[in-house]
Amino acid sequence: FSLLQKKKTPSPLFLNGEWGSGKTHSIRLVRALALESGFATMEAVLNARTCPPNYPQRIMPYMARNIAFGEERGIRSVIGSLLRDDKKAGHALATVGDRSQADIAQAASTLRALSSHGETALVGTSTAWRVLTGTDIAHSDYGYRRTKALLRLHWTTAFVRAAGAKGTVLLFDELETIDQLWNRRSRATAYEALGSFLDAPGTWCVFGITERFLRVVRDDARSDLYWQASIDGRRFLKMWRDGNEELIAPPKVADEQALELAAVVERMYRDAYPETGDCGAEVRSAVSDWSRNAARNPRRRPESGGAAEG
């Protein structure tokens, strides 16, 4: 966060954990910390069908829907609140310029003009939102639409920063689904998009992955696909080819920590719903079941390994 705040580009972070290891919870923790620290966040859960990494124009609507900054959620709320401050919006639009994306810059300017004239109803129904959310290009597979989506993302992160955010944290979960793409060419295109995400202005990328992704990307980085990739794709693969990736595992949770966490959650529910009775026994029973269930708990203790193998 400190590097991002200083307008430096941090190395991407890869959270490596299998199902049930707490990988997604760790991504949520990064998101919460980023928002508390004055950063914006955008996120997407990738899959090869509806949110594939080789088609950023399909990813963009998910990221627009999940953008967050301060108390605002969703691009209508985030961008809308920034545009309502005419002075701040004017400064941000002037600072960012069109970023080679005249359509999204024009859409934002249109919404700003409507907002400044008090046309609240027109702001809410304006077709300019389709450009900002990316839904106008989401169903097109043309290569130039891929480029347009990436440039729009770059514009959005630059605008949010110019309007007051310390930067934007891009969160991607389930990156291992890259192995579900049709072929090597599809993966090469995905690496190009990933390399462009890393290049977005004022951003830090955090990816949730499993061993499946590690096997695929390391094989591709050592194969001729590396030389066939675009400049952006090669930049992403070079990180793996040179062994410069930053990998961490989700924190392991021991029984004592699980009990403590469960007790905190119980207290939160009792504070929110005072009529809730004492659930201490149920909490302890749930934690005990969790710790014994090796199939759902890859963080199991070493002594439970025999049961898992059986």
Language model regions located:
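P-loop NTPase nucleotide-binding core
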Residues: 12-160, 273-277, 281-310
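Pre-Walker A adenine-sensing motif
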Residues: 1-8
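Residue-level preference for the first positions of well-ordered beta-strands
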Residues: 10-14, 167-169
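The catalytic "switch" region of P-loop NTPases
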Residues: 131-132, 137-280
